[in-house]
């Protein structure tokens, strides 16, 4: 009898084993104790390996549990398809479908503060969540990274077959995410004692190693959610790039004073009109104050906006609006005004004071991230030097994006979409940065200053 118990490991079975995931599993706390198991040294970490595309599509429906099975799995199973949290791949079934909440013209009265963000911030957050979702599922998809953001609506050249893909691993312990034996959390840990151009400054790690590092002040969650307040810190640490060029979130502030006469006592239409007519794509609205001659009537503001994989991480979504959705945890003053009808008696002029952040950089390229450099990641087209007639190669359909640490001399260059060129050969393509065109554009900018 004792032999049976030892072989089946009944007494030491993990809490998350069995049919489903334990409902009491909490999200990791910032002050959690580090893991007692030390990760292997950096020198032992294997580089990402190129992988083949899956022969079958990702599962989009919950797997049926085995009934009356006499087989006991000896491998710890953490992320079951019928578990407590919704699998990251479940949302792939909604890709390509339009979300009504993303459209400002949608007439249903709702919280409009997600439209306060600038296009720059929205594109970065969406690209980051797309990258982290693929990463937590076990792979890095270069084509997805290239087609996210503004490129999704452009006639961009791409291969009908798969472009470059590679395994995703925890850069601390080398855990392969496709093994799917750990919780669905992904973190960026910044080691601030190392220089900005050091590839070991940033770790993309699993939950276990996040707890091991135990540096909550320089750690940021990127799956299942990413916070707007974290963007400025991650940009400062050079986590966002346009190809090999760092993304800057430098900005100025501005206050706009507006006068609204034809409001018809409809506060929802007032807010929507301000967003549509008085907000530029590179601006983020911080607060909107609506007042009359009698004083302040409403202040619509927020402190944080969260982009989350699912509106409820414990409930499988039925509509596309509940996938990759922006969430505000603070109550909306505008929605409260709709409930108490405080604008119903206002007949005169409404004065609006709009405080905005105006970002100086335009995001017009593919958004990439600082992955660990890999050896022998080149082909006959992009070459070992990653140069095309002395121009830096930014992307190869066979080898993926050029590592952001490969050309440190270009890290201070400005990104111009007009300098992006391509060359095709043998059903493959490279994208490179035309330095002659770049110099012409720089001279034009300097002459206009």
From Swiss-Prot:
Annotated region described as Disordered, given as residue ranges: 1-68
Location of this chain's protein in the cell: Virion; Host cytoplasm; Host nucleus; Host cell membrane
GO CC annotation: host cell cytoplasm; host cell nucleus; host cell plasma membrane; membrane; virion component
Zinc finger (C4-type): 379-399
MF-aspect GO terms: DNA binding; zinc ion binding
Alphabetized UniProt keyword annotations: DNA-binding, Early protein, Host cell membrane, Host cytoplasm, Host membrane, Host nucleus, Membrane, Metal-binding, Virion, Zinc, Zinc-finger
The keyword Cytoplasm is assigned to this record: no
Chief location bin: virion
Record field: transmembrane: none
Biased composition (Pro residues): 31-42
Purpose of the protein: May act as a packaging protein or as a structural component associated with intranuclear baculovirus virion assembly.
Annotated protein name in UniProt: Early 53 kDa protein
Organism: Autographa californica nuclear polyhedrosis virus
Gene name of the record: ME53
């Amino acid at each position: 009898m004792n032999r049976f118990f030892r072989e089946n490991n009944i007494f030491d079975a993990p809490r998350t084993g069995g049919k489903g995931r334990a409902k009491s599993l909490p999200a990791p706390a910032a002050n959690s104790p580090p893991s007692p198991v030390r990760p292997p040294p950096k020198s032992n970490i294997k580089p990402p390996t190129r992988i083949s595309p899956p022969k079958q599509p990702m599962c989009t429906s919950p797997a049926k549990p085995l009934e009356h099975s006499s087989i006991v799995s000896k491998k710890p199973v953490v992320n079951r398809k019928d578990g407590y949290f919704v699998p990251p791949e479940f949302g792939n079934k909604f890709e390509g479908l339009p979300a009504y909440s993303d459209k400002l013209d949608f007439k249903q009265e709702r919280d409009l503060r997600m439209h306060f963000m600038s296009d720059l911030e929205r594109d970065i957050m969406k690209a980051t969540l797309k990258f982290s979702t693929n990463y937590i599922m076990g792979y890095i998809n270069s084509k997805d990274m290239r087609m996210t953001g503004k490129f999704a609506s452009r006639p961009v050249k791409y291969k009908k077959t798969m472009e470059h893909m590679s395994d995703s691993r925890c850069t601390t312990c080398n855990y392969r995410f496709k093994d799917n034996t750990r919780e669905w959390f992904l973190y960026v840990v910044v080691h601030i004692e190392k220089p900005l151009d050091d590839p070991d400054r940033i770790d993309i790690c699993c939950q276990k190693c996040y707890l091991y590092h135990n540096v909550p002040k320089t750690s940021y969650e990127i799956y299942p959610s990413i916070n707007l307040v974290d963007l400025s810190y991650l940009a400062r640490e050079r986590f966002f790039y346009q190809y090999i060029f760092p993304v800057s979130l430098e900005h100025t502030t501005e206050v706009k004073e507006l006068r609204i006469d034809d409001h018809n006592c409809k506060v929802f239409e007032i807010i929507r009109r301000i967003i549509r007519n008085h907000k530029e794509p590179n601006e983020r609205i911080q607060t909107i104050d609506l007042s009359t001659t009698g004083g302040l009537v409403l202040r619509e503001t927020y402190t944080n906006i969260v982009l989350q994989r699912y509106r409820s991480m414990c409930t499988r979504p039925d509509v596309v609006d509940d996938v990759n959705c922006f969430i505000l945890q603070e109550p909306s003053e505008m929605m409260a005004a709709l409930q108490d009808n405080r604008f119903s008696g206002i007949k005169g002029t409404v004065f609006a004071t709009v405080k905005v952040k105006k970002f100086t950089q335009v995001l017009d390229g593919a958004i990439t991230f600082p992955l660990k450099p890999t050896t022998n990641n080149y082909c006959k087209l992009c070459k070992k030097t990653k140069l095309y007639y002395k121009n830096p190669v930014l992307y190869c359909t066979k080898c993926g994006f050029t590592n952001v640490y490969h050309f440190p001399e270009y890290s201070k260059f400005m990104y111009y979409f007009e300098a992006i060129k391509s060359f095709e050969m043998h059903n493959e393509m490279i994208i490179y940065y035309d330095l002659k065109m770049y110099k012409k554009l720089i001279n034009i900018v300097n002459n206009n200053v």
